[in-house]
């Protein structure tokens, strides 16, 4: 399948090609500049100010759900993958194995509970669902994203005002965002979630880290030493949320350099393919109903797009984005989402 904007022709000799030697050199310069900015400006300033807060005993906050439950899907596949079926090739190729849920991190790294997110989980309607009880959509049942419905039902504020609001209808519908649940529970996603998951998995010997995951653990250990505060204390704090964004920027800058090097090596070896187009034409699609999901870790957290194809047409498409997890309205059983809890 080909996503719009992805296939850019590669030619080292053609000056008008979207990707040529001149433009690759410009990309390399930009990558090096980003690494310089993060390492020599962003992080030093961030840590200097953060250290002052720590010395003053102002590592506070800790709202949201980071102490209770965080979720991730994993990111940065090393090589092309064949999807999430057949044992989950996506999970075999990712470099950042944050495909898990960590619960009770606030009680300590070694006391936290880690549950892997697997290929089977993606198909299980008991694992991942969305509800619309407090969202402006019809049908409040908990549905798997493949079965999800998005038929609008806007009801306005508590008094039924649809243009000039007076009071939020907290007991009714009050958001355009659905409520995603993991095994019936709320979860927080984002850079902080990724760092909590990787750090916990490595420290509990559940993951043998590659160079990128080791970098994440070393980053957390270095900050813990600088602040003289345990990771389960500073990571879920307001300071920790801010710091992990900076650490994530440093990691991504290194990832840019790493994958750029792989691209240059591929081109040098004569590999200039930009996409696999075997499934581009709908005539190649099966006539029976098929379902699929695309996963990733966007900068803001766990991202998933779910599609069902029937009779060679898209019959359903649902996106459960990071903000769906963090900014969702409450659930009567699961409680409040990360944003609501923080407020």
State what each model feature region is.
Residues 305:
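A translation/RNA-centric and nucleic-acid-associated enzymatic feature enriched
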């Amino acid at each position: 399948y080909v996503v719009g904007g992805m296939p850019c022709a590669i030619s080292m000799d053609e000056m008008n090609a979207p990707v040529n030697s001149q433009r690759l050199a410009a990309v390399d310069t930009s990558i090096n500049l980003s690494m310089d900015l993060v390492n020599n400006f962003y992080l030093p300033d961030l840590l200097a100010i953060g250290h002052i807060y720590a010395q003053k005993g102002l590592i506070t906050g800790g709202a949201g759900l980071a102490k209770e439950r965080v979720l991730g899907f994993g990111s940065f596949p090393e090589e092309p993958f064949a999807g999430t079926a057949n044992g989950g090739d996506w999970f075999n190729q990712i470099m950042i194995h944050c495909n898990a849920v960590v619960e009770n991190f606030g009680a300590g790294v070694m006391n936290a509970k880690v549950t892997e997110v697997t290929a089977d989980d993606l198909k299980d309607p008991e694992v991942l669902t969305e509800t619309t009880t407090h969202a402006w959509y019809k049908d409040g049942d908990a549905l798997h994203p493949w079965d999800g419905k998005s038929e609008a039902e806007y009801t306005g504020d508590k008094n039924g005002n649809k243009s000039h609001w007076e009071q939020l209808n907290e007991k009714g519908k009050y958001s355009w965002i659905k409520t995603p649940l993991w095994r019936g529970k709320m979860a927080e996603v984002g850079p902080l979630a990724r760092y909590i998951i990787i750090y916990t998995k490595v420290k509990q010997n559940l993951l043998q880290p590659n160079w990128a995951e080791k970098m994440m653990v070393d980053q957390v250990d270095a900050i813990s030493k600088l602040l003289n505060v345990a990771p389960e204390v500073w990571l879920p704090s307001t300071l920790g949320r801010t710091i992990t964004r900076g650490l994530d920027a440093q990691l991504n800058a290194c990832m840019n350099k790493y994958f750029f090097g792989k691209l240059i090596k591929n081109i040098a070896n004569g590999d200039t393919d930009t996409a696999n187009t075997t499934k581009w034409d709908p005539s190649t699609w099966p006539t029976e109903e098929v379902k699929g999901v695309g996963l990733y870790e966007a900068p803001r957290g766990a991202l998933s797009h779910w599609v069902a194809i029937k009779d060679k047409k898209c019959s359903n498409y649902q996106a459960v984005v990071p903000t769906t997890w963090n900014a969702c309205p409450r659930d009567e059983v699961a409680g409040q989402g990360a944003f609501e809890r923080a407020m």
